[in-house]
Amino acid sequence: MATDGASCEPDFSRSPEDAAGATAEPAKKEFDVDTLSKSELRMLLSVMEGELEARDLVIEALRARRKEVFIQERYGRFNLNDPFLALQRDYEAGAGDKEKKPVCTNPLSILEAVMAHCRKMQERMSTQLAAAESRQKKLEMEKLQLQALEQEHKKLSACLDEERNKNKHVVLMLVKECKQLSGKVIEEAQKLDEVMTKLEEEKKKTTALEEELSAEKQRSTEMEAQMEKQLSEFDTEREQLRAKLHREEAHTADLKEEIDKMKKMIEQLKRGSDSKPGLSLPRKTKDRRLISVSVGTEVSVTKSVACQTDSAIESIEPVKKLPLTVPAKPSTGSPLVSASTKGNMCTNATLVRPGIDRQASHGDLTISSVPAAPTPSASRTEENGPSTGSAPDPTSSTPPLPNNAAPPTVQTPGTAAQSYSQAPPVHSLHSPCANVSLHPGLNPRIQAARFRFQGNANDPDQNGNTSQSPPSRDVSPTSRDNLVAKQLARSTVTQALSRFTSPQTGAPPRPGAAPTGDVSSHTPVSRTSLKTPGVSRVDRGNPPPIPPKKPGLSQTPSPPHPQLKVIMDSSRAASAGVKVDNKTVAVPPSSLPQGNRVISEENLLKSSSPQLPPKPSIDLTVAPAGCAVSALATSQVGAWPAEPPGLNQPACSESSLVIPNTIAFCSSINPVSASSCRTGASVSLLVTASGWSPSLTPLLMSGGPAPLAGRPTLLQQAAAQGNVTLLSMLLNEEGLDINYSCEDGHSALYSAAKNGHTDCVRLLLNAQAQVNAADKNGFTPLCAAAAQGHFKCIELLIANDANINHAADGGQTPLYLACKNGNNECIKLLLGAGSDRSVKTRDGWTPVHAAVDTGNVDNLKLLMYYEAPIPGNSFNEEKLESNIIDLDQEEESPEGIPKTVVPADLINHADREGWTAAHIAASKGFKNCLEILCRHRGLEPERRDKCSRTAHDVATDDCKHLLENLHAFKIPLRISIAEIQPGNHGSDDFECDNIICTLNIRKQTSWDDFSKAVSQALINHFQAVSSDGWWTLEDMTFNNTADSSIGLGASSVQSIMLGNVPWSAGQNFTLFPWEFMRKNKAEQVTVILSGPQEGCLSSVSYTSMIPLQMLQNYLRLVEQYHNVIFHGPEGSLQDYIAHQLALCMKHRQIAAGFTCEIVKAQVHAGFSKEQLVDLFISSACLIPVKQSPVNKKIIIILENLEKSSLSELLGDFLTPLENRSTETPYTLQKGNGMSECYYFHENCFLMGTIAKACLQGSDLLVQQHFRWVQLRWDGEPMQGLLQRFLRRKVVNKFRGQLPSPCDPVCRTVDWALAVWCQLNSCIARLGTPEALLGPKYFLSCPVVPGHAQATVKWMSHLWNAIIAPRVQEAILSRASVKRQHSLGQTTAKKHPSQGQQAIVKAALSILLNKAVLHGCPLQRAELDQHTADFKGGSFPLSMVSSYNSCSRKKAESGAWRKVSTSPRKKSGHFSSPVWNKPDLSEEGIKNKAISQLNYNGSALLAKQKSLENDLSLTLDQRLSLGSDDETDLVKELQNMCSSKSESDISKIADSRDDLRRLHSSGNNPAFSAAVNNPKMPVSQKEVSPLSSHQTTECSNNKSKTELGVSRVRSFLPVPRSKVTQCSQNTKRSSSSSNTRQIEINNNSKEEIWNLRKK
């Protein structure tokens, strides 16, 4: 090794550079490790290790010899006598190490160099070896991964082959199926073609059949017309033959009478007695005047005219023939009737009624009602029957004339023809009552009765005239020997009957009557009418001709009846006028009899084919001169025509047409009322006005007394017409059968009840009439009254023990008929009397079927819920009425539906076809009726009819939807929050129960579906509440699994209560949810969220709307760091959060087996550190050092720490709290000079709350020792808390639904949110963070739909009670921050200067208008009314603008937060302190300025005047305002006024008058003088604030005229940065400011809101 070491010595013969270069070259070649293999590297490493060991041995040996060798090498070659020895020593001692060169070779240095080189090589080799090993390992790992990938690849390939084979098989199967399906499609297409071909053939056949059917129908119609024509001809021929027979019989009788008279006269002559000359052959001695009527082949229509009560006075002396003119139409100009004549006549009306089909079945009751209005001459028809209309006195000499009728005159023969051609037809003396519609066929019985009861044609009537049949051409004179006796007998009976009969009104026209012509005037006619025994009838097959319009007539349409042609010549069939000996004859008024009454009887046509008769011709026998024409006509009344079974006859079917004393022509037809006249039956032809009946007619005609045998028929007629007087007279007669029934079985009581004549029913019942007498169809009077809806008659009948459950032949009961009629009062009376609801008709229908069939909801409700009240129990009746009313109100709960009294069997009863009431309601689309039926729990909607159809199968679309949701049970879903103690930590505004939606539970709903519905409803609610906008649940797409933004979801639910039964999601009961809810009477589903009691914060998150994740983070901070303080603006829910976190921690510790206690302390201004120490020691949070830690968990909450100094209160506890061990104790000094050491253990948690936005001063020293949770108003969770909370409030108010964004409630809530945000933003700009507000005060915002005024009123209370005082205090404290040192804090706060007060009020006004009133949802007028409720809302802001800042405070001062804004380029004459939306256009500014000139008028001026007097500043006070803080505060207010980022408040400037009043205020004489007199010199001291303000104004403002309108400038200030400054002239202008004038440029383009010259 020594040799090796010696060999390594350097060669000093070469230079060091050459040696180094020679050594480096072989080293690069020998030691290139990268090229060596692993074995070579190992060999090299072993050689080098051996070398190192050898060298270490050499080094140790050399060290032992080092000293000796060193001395020998250094000094051994020199001796002491050598002079160079000192030089060598000095050389080595004086030079540096780098400059010295070794004298001899040093083996130690060489060895050290070799050792260093070897170490480097060893490190390099080890590094390379480690790299090689790592590469080797990596390579092996990659090989293993490659093998694994290859194996996986093989597996995947095998799987792929299998799948390929499977897919190939599936594809083959699909191909086969496609082929099969294509074949089926082709077959179906062929079948479809065949079916379509058959369908076309069937359609063709159907079309052919329809054509044949129509042809057959037409053929049958023609045949029927021919048959009708033939029948008409037969009737005509029969009538002619009968008339001829009658004439022959009458002629024979006359001849016999003449023979008898002649015999008597011969006898008298023989006896020599005197005879009266007038009795012998009167008809031969008098002129015989006949009015012949052409009959031809037409059928005659008869008119019955009754005798009048007053007998006519006959004139015996002959009268000269006078011209008689009979106009054919009523004249409006000059009627031919004397004013002294009066009479009654038939109404000129067309009465058309449908014919009766005698073959039709009337098993059911069909009630048809037509509303009617009576004619002007007719009286009203009431339930008691028609009352007598007011008629003029029949004895008066002058009848009433219409307004348009001229006085009647008697025309001369020369004017008669002209009058006839110009005047419309009128019913005059010889004009009968016109009949314009005739019955198609007259009953043979009526014909027989007519000819049976008709008097002799030649018998003289009571006026002395004989009636002659129309076709008679040669009637011989008759005898008049018995004339006086017959007249006396006839008049006696007539007057007796008429005495008890009041004048009746004419029956109004029937429903469906053909319209008659309108007559323009109402002309009074004579009381004497003309009888018409025979008038030709209309051919049934052909329609009647329409009378042509004649020239010269009035424009009113002519009446449908033709003119009456009266002829004197018996050989003529028709004539144009009435002539006597070819002269026109006029009857004088003096010859007319008085007191005659006319009653007509009319036959009616079918309503389906109303026809008009042709012009008939009438033959009249004219009496001799001096005798009036007879008014007594032959009666046409016979037996009643047979009525069909059933109750569909009109109520006035037995009523005759009664004519009042005075009848005027009506211009139109008024339909008859339903209670007085109905369609479906013929009219009985009665003469009830005079008391005549058909049975009495022949006897009265013959002049004999009236026996009582015909009284029952008259009784029925009086009862049917409601004639109480006649009825009472007849009932007082003895021997009268009041229970007499006609051939249809109708009794008098039946007729009265059917027509609703209550008084008649009462009279008959008092007379012991049979109350249960039935007609031939089994209908009783009660049935008739129920069918017609006469509830008063029903009440009387029930009171007289009528059978309420009587069933007719078809099974119809009165209740059934009442339900068919649809009268609630009738149904209620019958049900109250105990009528049976279950009686069934022949068809199987019940009253429920009838009520449902009419679709009357009220009737069905009465049937199902009305109970017969207990006598004397009024409470029961009130309860029943309330139950019926409650049905109209939709109740969600099953308890809201009253109990039905109808059993399930009756509801589900089926008729003969198998249809239930539900089938009927569903098929007719009566959804309301079906809904009421569905409320019955026993309804079986699946009941099938005989065709196997359910109600759903036959229902309409609406009813199908109702049946599908039949068993849906709506129940509200609520979220309940437990453990919310009222009045604790600001939780008063939290709602414990919130309705989130309504669940719709159907009968088939399973528990899984119910669980999913509840979970989905919760998720939808959480996401809807936490969403950003007002979106409905339909507009929002929710994720079923994701939680909401507040972190709540289905997992937050602790339990669910179904009513009072607990239930958890996924739990199944034996009953389905629908049955379970019904059985347990569950009215709601309550969801209980997990809360602190379970160690969770879900309920806390939902209550406070703080995201769950943030609450969990707060809890983690408290558990981890033990010392946490929550701080933020006042009202940020610090105390609530701390308390809920403490509760959660407590229950978690209790669940873990520890005991835990919560200790709360309210910190106030007098709370000392000693009290805090006592609290810590008493709660075992601070324990002595000698004591071992306790296992009890203690949570201490220090509230309201902002009221004390943190550094003074917690300064000594900071280190012990941060380092909780015995090593950092807290030393407590006791009063006796002793001290004791305590420490905080690990089981103690300390939480504090501070209602302060930020810390200041010495309190910052405490900050680093605690964990701080800052609740900023502009950051989460406070930023979105109010929005989420109010949104949940709205959802609860709308019962789980979100209103539309345009709803007023949404706008009101958005306004409340904007107020909170804008208010804090403005307060932050003012630099008063102590006035910031948290969302707590806004949680009580009322949500009242439709009443935004309540929210504005609440906002005014909040502003006056909380916001305004806090802002005032904050601004005062900021404005007087530097004055407190000189004046004292107490003095500054208690006595603020007027300038400070002005700043406060200006700030309040700006905040109110910018943050509160801006965006209010109320209209301008309503908002103006509420503005006065806000404190500081009427402050004149010109006070702020008139303030001038001092130049001492520069703009770059950091005390206030500045906002770079630009001035608003707006001006105008505004007087309202309310901000509107900005309108930057000049036109908009002008319009708004003009529109707001007169805002609040005198009230505003008076209020501002009082404020200005209080707030006007003197010059000294202005100078005192010039402190730096106040200047910056005013600048910030000015910036807020001009900020574009805020609401536009440039419109709050005062009017010109207000400014002048302010300028001229007596409190500021110098200022007002400077403004009002700009040329007056002012001292520098007086105007220094103004001049300093003017130094920054630009002297070259450009003038511009704005639309030619000069406006008052807005005096709100603008920032200095936005005004061009003339900095070069600042000092000069400041020094010479006393000579400058105040300029106000109204037309400047740049708005400079400062005081300048006008």
UniProtKB/Swiss-Prot annotation:
Residues found modified as Asymmetric dimethylarginine? 499
Composition-biased stretches, type Low complexity, lie in 368-379, 1623-1637
Q: Where are the ANK repeats?
A: 710-740, 744-773, 777-806, 810-839, 843-872, 913-943
Query: Cellular component GO terms, alphabetically?
Result: actin cytoskeleton; cell cortex; dendritic spine; FAR/SIN/STRIPAK complex
Q: Which PROSITE patterns match?
A: ANK_REP_REGION (PS50297), ANK_REPEAT (PS50088)
Describe its partners and assembly state.
Interacts with CTTN/cortactin SH3 domain. Interacts with STRN, STRN4/zinedin and MOB4/phocein; this interactions mediate the association with the STRIPAK core complex and may regulate dendritic spine distribution of the STRIPAK complex in hippocampal neurons. Activation of glutamate receptors weakens the interaction with STRN and STRN4.
Organism field: Atelerix albiventris
Q: From start to end residue, where is composition biased (Basic and acidic residues)?
A: 1644-1654
Region annotation (Disordered) ranges: 1-31, 361-432, 455-480, 495-596, 1454-1478, 1556-1654
Q: Which PANTHER family match?
A: CTTNBP2 N-TERMINAL-LIKE PROTEIN, FILAMIN/GPBP-INTERACTING PROTEIN
Would the keyword Phosphoprotein be found if you checked this record's keyword annotation? yes
- The molecule here is called Cortactin-binding protein 2
**Comp. bias regions, Polar residues:** 384-395, 411-422, 518-531, 1581-1598
Do the record's keywords include tRNA-binding?
Answer: no
* Positions where Phosphoserine occurs in the chain: 1523
Give start-end ranges for the coiled-coil region(s): 119-276
Instruction: Indicate where this protein resides in the cell.
Output: Cytoplasm, Cell cortex; Cell projection, Dendritic spine
What role does it play? Regulates the dendritic spine distribution of CTTN/cortactin in hippocampal neurons, and thus controls dendritic spinogenesis and dendritic spine maintenance. Associates with the striatin-interacting phosphatase and kinase (STRIPAK) core complex to regulate dendritic spine distribution of the STRIPAK complex in hippocampal neurons.
Q: Which GO terms describe its molecular function?
A: protein phosphatase 2A binding
